[in-house]
């Protein structure tokens, strides 16, 4: 731990000063992605410097075979819930109120955005302008953000079913329901699940195992920042494949261990988040796993707009502060150059964002 972090957090609760109970740990003998036993230490003495909840210090290993990263040892499934005491999906997000008076400029932006959403995803938002579907193509950064909010899903036909795994407080399912999907979710965190249920969403408290009987049932399944949290990602993707109808779509969004941010900020990169992030993929390892399980038409999406937020959070962590602090932060000339002058390849983006289809028989 850096001296800066020691000094800054001296007046805060420092849960890492206590060890995670030894009887609540499990060892990881082989890579959870490719089953290789060959590995090197990527980072050690990692702490929960994101939410300041979890005790213990942790070691992140890099698999020599597939370049994925994983914790060993790690909290076992029975105890991992202790690391989620103040997780950000416990509360309900703000709802857009189109009745609020805004400036003419912001009203036009909203009309154009709503016009694009209505055309592309099937929402019925008002006020809306049909020009939105054309103007959106001229603003690639904003288009990326809008498409990722709706997870690149097709416009649904009647009675198409969507499942969100790890749905949190239901923010995305509210959007998908508005677009015409028949939505449901599963969420292991009772606090987050109850927040979603209070919004009238069908959410089961637990894991995907609750839905084992619904083979070939869903037209789309989404996993946004979920797969890095599970102990057995391969089994999760196999279960998703069974639940999807032939030709059904899966959407995945997860941190990228090969990103520029991971290289620049190292143990303070926001995407590590020990001990909640158990496995961190790179694009090649995730795509290889999907192909082996039975997915096709894998399409990596470009979400470069997320870089600045990740860099700012990581810089705050580097300074020993919470990534969600409101204090201003200086990124430094090199990071600013990365943001303003570079257009990173998809394998260097902060997140792996992709869609794939279950192979049709």
What is the role of each PLM region?
Residues 2-30, 41, 45-53, 299-361:
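A C-terminal cap/extension of S-adenosyl-L-methionine-dependent methyltransferases
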Residues 72-75, 227, 256, 304:
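Flexible, active-site-proximal loop/turn residues at the rims of small-molecule/cofactor binding pockets
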Residues 67-179:
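Extended interfacial segments that mediate partner engagement and assembly in macromolecular machines
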Residues 3-8, 16-32, 38-39, 143-268, ...:
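Conserved SAM-binding loop
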Residues 76, 189, 209, 303-304:
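Residue-level "edge-of-site" marker
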Residues 70-72, 80, 172-173, 192, ...:
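Short catalytic/ligand-binding loop motif for oxyanion handling, primarily in non-cytosolic enzymes
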Residues 65, 88, 256, 304, ...:
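Non-catalytic surface loops within mature trypsin-like serine protease
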Residues 5-110:
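N-terminal juxtadomain amphipathic helix
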């Amino acid at each position: 731990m850096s001296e800066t972090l020691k000094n800054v957090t001296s007046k805060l609760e420092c849960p890492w000063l206590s060890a995670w109970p030894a009887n609540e740990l499990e060892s990881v003998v082989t890579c959870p992605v490719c089953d290789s036993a060959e590995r090197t230490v990527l980072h050690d003495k990692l702490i929960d410097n994101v939410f300041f909840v979890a005790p213990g210090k942790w070691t992140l290993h890099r698999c020599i075979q597939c370049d994925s990263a994983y914790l060993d040892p790690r909290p076992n499934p029975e105890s991992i819930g202790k690391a989620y005491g103040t997780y950000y999906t416990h509360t309900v997000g703000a709802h857009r109120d189109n009745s609020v008076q805004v400036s003419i400029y912001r009203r036009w932006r909203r009309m154009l955005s709503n016009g694009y959403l209505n055309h592309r995803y099937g929402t019925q938002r008002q006020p809306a302008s049909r020009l939105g579907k054309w103007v959106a193509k001229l603003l690639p950064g904003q288009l990326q953000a809008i498409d990722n909010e709706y997870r690149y899903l097709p416009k649904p036909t009647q009675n198409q079913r969507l499942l969100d795994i790890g749905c949190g407080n239901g923010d995305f399912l509210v959007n998908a329901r508005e677009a015409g999907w028949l939505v449901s979710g599963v969420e292991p965190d009772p606090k987050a699940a109850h927040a979603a249920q209070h919004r009238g969403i069908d959410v089961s408290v637990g894991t995907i195992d609750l839905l084992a009987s619904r083979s070939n049932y869903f037209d789309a399944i989404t996993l946004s920042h979920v797969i890095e949290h599970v102990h057995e990602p391969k089994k999760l993707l196999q279960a998703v494949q069974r639940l999807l109808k032939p030709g059904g779509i899966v959407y995945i969004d997860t941190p990228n261990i090969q990103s520029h941010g991971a290289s620049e900020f190292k143990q303070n990169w926001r995407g590590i988040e020990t001990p909640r992030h158990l496995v961190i993929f790179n694009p090649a390892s995730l795509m290889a796993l999907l192909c082996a399980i039975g997915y096709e038409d894998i399409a990596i999406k470009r979400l470069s707009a997320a870089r600045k937020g990740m860099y700012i959070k990581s810089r705050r962590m580097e300074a020993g502060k919470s990534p969600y602090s409101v204090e201003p932060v200086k990124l430094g000339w090199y990071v600013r150059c990365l943001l303003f002058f570079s257009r990173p390849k998809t394998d260097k983006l902060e997140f792996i964002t992709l869609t794939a289809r279950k192979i049709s028989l």
